[in-house]
């Protein structure tokens, strides 16, 4: 692995805990037609009663969002997220609906969807205009606890280097409006139409971050920093860094592996800082090229290793990353989860699997879009 780190000149105390939380957005589909369906009021109210604030409506009425509690371990997060997935599925079944965890429905039209009538979403629709109407997309967000604000600002540009890797592994949105887009993550194409998205800027300090974002807040351009939708951002509500670039995962275990990757990377970067080292900062333009490659090809064509200026297959990159993260994954108890990412790099991500199902259904003369949705339903329930 080429050297990507350099001396910082100042050390730091290693964090004792790297708590994590996972947020997922699901689509609701009718069990018979496999078309998108709006969440009945009774479904939302029972889910909210069952899970005490861990389930909420999303921008579109066909969406539902879940969020785990903060956890110190992936094992604890697994139980929480499994409980949420299973619970939402059981409640949805009472209305002949089922959730799927995918970033774009294979054949639904955004023109047929309606946004949730809440003051927050009404304001968003007004602010974003026609851009908001096309937001028929779902994502996955991972929060990692970082108590120190200065450390959050320091870690952001370092962790940004790995955002394309996370996107490549997670890509689950090859289809849009019934067509193969040629991309592995079409979700990002839609999301990037919003303002204040993409790779985060690099800030020299927490004070600079607050000054910069504060300009928009002070002028009334945005209400607060929740309206900043970078791929990675400091959370407005929690003392965390929130990774937002990933497509949502049909499989529970794949979601947990990506969360484990975030947690282990954060621990590795803090461990380096304690030794007066830091991951080398690469220009946003260069990391953006890897972001595009991940969006377009997923794990299929590899990413650029800027340390030795070469294109490398995802399997090679994951072998190198696993070597770097082994100490951290062992300390966190997540070696199996990190190893699963190597399997995704080798055998394909969700976009790969969806295209395979689509092609096989076409070869049999079946409705390929419906076959993909049935596949997504199976994957949602596979690990429960």
UniProtKB/Swiss-Prot annotation:
<keyword id="KW-0547">Nucleotide-binding</keyword>
<keyword id="KW-0436">Ligase</keyword>
<dbReference type="InterPro" id="IPR011793">
    <property type="entry name" value="YbdK"/>
</dbReference>
<keyword id="KW-0067">ATP-binding</keyword>
<dbReference type="InterPro" id="IPR050141">
    <property type="entry name" value="GCL_type2/YbdK_subfam"/>
</dbReference>
<dbReference type="GO" id="GO:0042398">
    <property type="term" value="P:modified amino acid biosynthetic process"/>
</dbReference>
<protein>
    <recommendedName>
        <fullName>Putative glutamate--cysteine ligase 2</fullName>
        <ecNumber>6.3.2.2</ecNumber>
    </recommendedName>
</protein>
<comment type="similarity">
    <text>Belongs to the glutamate--cysteine ligase type 2 family. YbdK subfamily.</text>
</comment>
<comment type="function">
    <text>ATP-dependent carboxylate-amine ligase which exhibits weak glutamate--cysteine ligase activity.</text>
</comment>
<dbReference type="InterPro" id="IPR006336">
    <property type="entry name" value="GCS2"/>
</dbReference>
<dbReference type="Pfam" id="PF04107">
    <property type="entry name" value="GCS2"/>
</dbReference>
<dbReference type="GO" id="GO:0005524">
    <property type="term" value="F:ATP binding"/>
</dbReference>
<dbReference type="InterPro" id="IPR014746">
    <property type="entry name" value="Gln_synth/guanido_kin_cat_dom"/>
</dbReference>
<dbReference type="GO" id="GO:0004357">
    <property type="term" value="F:glutamate-cysteine ligase activity"/>
</dbReference>
């Amino acid at each position: 692995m080429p050297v990507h780190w350099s001396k910082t000149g100042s050390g730091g105390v290693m964090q004792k805990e790297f708590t994590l939380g996972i947020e997922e957005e699901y689509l609701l589909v009718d069990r018979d037609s496999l078309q998108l369906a709006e969440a009945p009021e009774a479904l939302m109210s029972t889910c909210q009663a069952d899970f005490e604030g861990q389930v909420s409506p999303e921008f579109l009425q066909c969406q539902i969002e879940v969020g785990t509690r903060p956890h110190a371990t992936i094992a604890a997060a697994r139980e929480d997220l499994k409980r949420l997935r299973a619970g939402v599925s059981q409640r949805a079944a009472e209305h002949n609906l089922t959730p799927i965890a995918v970033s774009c429905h294979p054949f639904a039209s955004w023109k047929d969807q309606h946004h949730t009538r809440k003051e927050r979403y009404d304001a968003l629709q007004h602010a974003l205009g026609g851009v908001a109407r096309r937001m028929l997309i779902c994502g996955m967000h991972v929060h990692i606890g970082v108590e120190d604000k200065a450390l959050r600002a320091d870690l952001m540009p370092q962790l940004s280097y790995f955002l394309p890797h996370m996107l490549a592994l997670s890509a689950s949105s090859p289809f849009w409006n019934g067509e193969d887009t040629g991309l592995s993550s079409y979700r990002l194409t839609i999301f990037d139409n919003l303002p204040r998205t993409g790779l985060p800027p690099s800030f020299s300090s927490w004070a600079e971050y607050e000054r910069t974002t504060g300009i928009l807040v002070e002028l009334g351009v945005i209400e607060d920093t929740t309206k900043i939708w970078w791929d990675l951002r400091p959370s407005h509500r929690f003392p965390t860094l929130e990774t937002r670039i990933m497509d949502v995962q049909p499989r529970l275990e794949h979601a947990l592996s990506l969360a484990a990757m975030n947690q282990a990377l954060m621990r590795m970067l803090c461990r380096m800082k304690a030794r007066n080292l830091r991951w080398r900062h690469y220009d946003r333009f260069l990391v953006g090229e890897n972001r595009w490659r991940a969006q377009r090809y997923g794990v299929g064509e590899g990413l650029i290793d800027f340390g030795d200026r070469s294109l490398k297959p995802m399997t090679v990159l994951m072998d190198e990353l696993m070597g770097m993260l082994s100490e951290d994954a062992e300390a966190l108890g997540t070696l199996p989860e990190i190893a699963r990412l190597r399997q995704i790099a080798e055998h394909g991500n969700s976009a790969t699997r969806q295209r395979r199902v689509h092609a096989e259904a076409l070869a049999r003369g079946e409705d390929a879009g419906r076959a993909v949705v049935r596949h997504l339903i199976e994957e949602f329930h596979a690990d429960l």
